[in-house]
Amino acid sequence: SIREYLCGEAMHGLKIPSSRSLIIFTGEEPVFRETTEPGAMIVRSASTHVRFGNFEYLCHNDKKELLPELMTHVIEEYFSEYNELENKFELFFESVVRKTAELIAHWQTVGFAHGVMNTDNMSILGETFDFGPFGFLENYQPNYICNHSDYQGRYAFNNQPNIGLWN
């Protein structure tokens, strides 16, 4: 959690869209990562907590009929300039793709490797959050993997643009 706080602040300082930390607190229970360590939680502030995974969830749980309702809500809340347009869903999609590409381009510029770019960790507004096992390149290593459990290199530094597009 402290790493996530520090990285969020660093990203903000680098002018890369990012969630910010409101509070960090510890608990009594140990957590099991690579080693056992004290548990901690972070409460983040972000422009939205709507993720790609919110849409994916509906698709994978036979609730596709709810997609237009979710998209309409998201457009009303975050893309109101598209509200009255006939092709608002298309414009929304294009905007999410553009914001994601811009975010990942920022990451690549500073050598940031996210580590867990699954759909639940990707913001529809192109903000960095859910840092997890992130890392920064100390020297140029295109295949750099910061996530110790990413044995296949799915989220390797040089694969981030592909994963962003796939998501």
Model-derived segments and spans:
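Conserved ATP-binding subdomain of kinase catalytic cores across diverse folds
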Residues: 1-86, 102, 124-129, 136, ...
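Catalytic activation segment of kinase domains across protein kinase-like and atypical kinase folds
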Residues: 30, 36, 109-114, 118-165
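Glycine- and acidic
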Residues: 81-90, 150-158
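Conserved N-terminal phosphate-binding loop of PLP-dependent enzymes in the Aspartate aminotransferase
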Residues: 90-93, 162
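Mobile, glycine/GP-rich and aromatic-enriched active-site lid/loop segments adjacent to catalytic centers
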Residues: 102-110
